[in-house]
Amino acid sequence: MLPKNLKPFHIKNENLIRIGPKLDGGYVLDKRTIPLTEKIITCGLNDDWEFEKHFLKIKPNCEIIAYDHTVDRQFWIDRFKKDIVHFFLLKKLRLRKIISIFKYYDYNNFFKSGNKHHQLKISNKNIENKEITLNKILHDYDNLILKIDIEGDEYNILKQILDNSKKINFEQKITEKNYPINGLDYKNSHRKNDFILNFQD
């Protein structure tokens, strides 16, 4: 059972808009919140910021702040090597896929123009230059969209999301629920029940 402040509610179709790609990485939002949004906090970046780029076309003065400890220099080196191999194996023949080989240049351009990417892991504790909590990230922010896609760790920070929902004016919360849940023992029913009860009202 979802807590009340995470349950979806009915919105008329004419108030909905899809932002980002048609496939993975795109999300349907209530378009009435777009003019009110001052910042997008993105937790989990990987190599996809199409949602953020599309949003900025609609509201150019919105600030983008991303957190992902996995996207570093080695990430781009490994990605480029893999893409080059695929290219020579004739797996990247479409123009879109060929352009994606040079995604690093798009990353540099996007995060040089006032948008920020912090190489920090979203966690339940603050460790300088390594890990950061949502509580610390959201401390000084309001009127924002919180976008979370951290591959199974979303549940580990769900309590922080709930706590901040009571204090901060979120225009919208976007969370991808990935399975398996990191750190959860599926064979132990007591742990599963404890996990679920932890987030019920």
What are the language-model segments listed below?
Residues 39-41, 57-65, 73, 78, ...:
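Conserved acidic-Pro-Pro-aromatic motif
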Residues 14-128, 141, 179-181:
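SAM cofactor-binding core of SAM-dependent methyltransferases
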Residues 2-9, 27-33, 138-143:
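Generic detector of short, locally flexible boundary/turn motifs and exposed helical patches
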Residues 128-136:
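A Trp-anchored, charged/polar loop motif used as the substrate-binding/catalytic surface
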Residues 1-21:
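N-terminal accessory regions of S-adenosyl-L-methionine
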